Amino acid sequence: MHTHNHFKTPSDAEEVDDLDDEMVMGVIAEIEQEVLFESDSDDDGFGAEQLGAPPPDDDNDQISSSDDSFDPNAEDSDSDDSMQHEEQAQATSAKRRKDDDGPSGSNRDVETNFDLDLEDETDETVRAIIAAIKKPRSAPPEIKLEDFVTDISFHPERNIIALATIIGDVHLYEYANEGNKLIRTIEVHSKACRDVEFTEDGRNLLTCSKDKCVMVTDMETEKLKKLYETAHDDAINTLHVLNENLFATGDDAGTVKLWDLRTKQHVFELKQIDDQVTQLLSNEQNTLLLATSADGYLTTFNIPGRKLYVQSEPYEEELNCMGIYRGDSKLVVGTSKGKLYSYNWGSFGYHCDMYPGIKSPISLMIPITDRIACVAGEDGNIRACHITPYRNLGVVGQHNMPIEALDVNSTGELLASSSHNNDVRFWNVKYFEDFGDIKYNEKHNAYKEQRHNLPSSKCTNTGDFFADLAKQEDDEDDDAT
């Protein structure tokens, strides 16, 4: 999960909401079903009279009158002619219906009527649905894999995303709004690949695994470039790229190592943590290396001095993720209790502020801008929050299951997430560039903000629906006057 500090200025192009493919198919199916129902209702209009049979009431009247004047010796001279006319009428009606239906039956009628509805629909709700269906995509479609996705990483220069899986493979996809294309599947590890990262120049792909190895793959040749076999004594959980040559790794036992791609062995090793290292992070100058861990410590290492810088006071919760904000002046850490701890840069012994965050555990954090972060966890929602002062901005996107990985591309416009459902979804977060700075004394509704759906969300807000209705009524009143 690689963080980026470069953000692109928003263009003037019209932004559109992403529409879930399943939602589109569902809407089309409902419209087709409605049209089919109307077509069936029209077919029901072929009654007994159209088929040549007399109406039921007339039959009763005729029977009643014939009973009164019944003559057993009389001859029914019209009976044969009546039956013949009835058979001819039935055959003519059946032929007419067959010609109307054609070889495909009612499906042809549904198709024709649906096309007409697209052009001539007067119902405002249906027109809105059709307009939404015709909108172009603002983000690539979902990627679905057979295996569990453990981590994802965007290429820094190309439209490529790497997906690490639990069986040790890495899938390289070329993504676009029109569709995604699998470039290649690289079999790199014998056990679960836990972290995947590109170097800053994008030439190399680094992976670490439960098999205790670190692999370096050349992106140009797509072949193995270097193997650090048994890089740790324990399973490696996380990896962080500092630049095109340096990277750091942390394992399940708390050991942190710094590596240089130009050497065969690690540069230095430090063991100051007693539990799993959950994330590694460094500042832009690469002078400090920070590590969060499951034992509730924030540990900072001095890279040039190759020694411990400071270790925080213990917390009664797991520290899972972190990010740097406000011009490298603030460090924010997410915890297993859904809290966010803020530290002044350099003062990592104890937090200066604590934000309530969300009620569910926070396991992932990605800086989108210098003041906006996206956090995710077990509840399956990706939420945006403003840092210093803290504000919930709303829901960026959703998954049906807990979210496992999160990353943002180099421009800061596209966010990708994967869940326990083996799916990877994309969210266009370009709109964050237009968010203004939040003031400390600004009034806000915390309850509403936490449930507010942002433009990239696949859900809509109830208030938006009623606002559109009110606007429509105002427009109608203006037209009437």
From Swiss-Prot:
BP GO annotations: defense response to Gram-negative bacterium
Source taxon at top rank: Eukaryota
Start and stop residues of the WD repeats: 144-183, 188-227, 231-269, 272-311, 314-353, 398-437
SUPFAM superfamilies in UniProt: WD40 repeat-like (SSF50978)
Pfam family, one: WDR55
Keywords annotated in UniProt: Repeat, WD repeat
Residue ranges with Acidic residues bias: 12-23, 31-46, 68-81
Chain positions covered by the region annotation Disordered: 1-116
Family recorded in the similarity comment: Belongs to the WD repeat WDR55 family.
Protein name: WD repeat-containing protein 55 homolog
